[in-house]
Amino acid sequence: FAMTIVITGCITELGKNLVGRPRPDFLARCKPTQSSIQSTKYHNLLVDHTICSTPITSHTLADGFKSFPSGHSSMAFSGLTFLAWYIRGFFTAIMRKLTCTVYEQVPDEEPIRLEEGLDRETEEAPQHLVLSSLVLPLVPVILAAYISVSRLMDYRHHPTDILAGTILGASVATAVYHVYHKSHTIKA
């Protein structure tokens, strides 16, 4: 889990510093003054931080240039997608134990597994476990989506920032989970 958070955090910060995209609420952070905007020079466009009345050393203004990708989205999807995979793996392991084959017991010897193709006794996994293994992993993913959409509704990110953070976080979590939890992955 920690590996997922560290990798996602590093990639997110690298992206924010390389891209430097202004946030949707940048003008509210910048507080430009009419005297600093020369309409003939800038044609009423925000060019750089020089038109801002907020000092460039201000954390608020510096953070205004770190919109892409969304850190909240990437971290939420990173941690909560990992949790979703973990929950799915947990239920998969339980169902494997419940549906394992019955072994033939030979006296005074080790148990011998019946060969493939021969009759084997198996138990069906209880339906509530099957349903739980499909529904419960969705809860963390829905929570991550809620966190991401809240950043859009708060006017802190553009939709593409949210999408990039979502893809980044979910991809890193999926990759790290499948590398470190190979025994829980479902084989097709």
Task: Annotate the PLM regions.
Residues I11-R21, M153:
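C-terminal TM-helix exit segments that contain a strictly Trp-centered aromatic cap at the helix terminus
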Residues T33-A188:
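Membrane-embedded catalytic cores of phosphoryl/pyrophosphoryl-handling enzymes
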Residues V6, V19-P22, F91:
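Short, well-ordered alpha-helical segments in soluble proteins
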Residues L18, P22-T33, Q38-Y42:
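Chymotrypsin/trypsin-fold serine protease catalytic domain
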Residues F1-L14, L27-P32, S73:
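Interfacial segments of alpha-helical transmembrane regions
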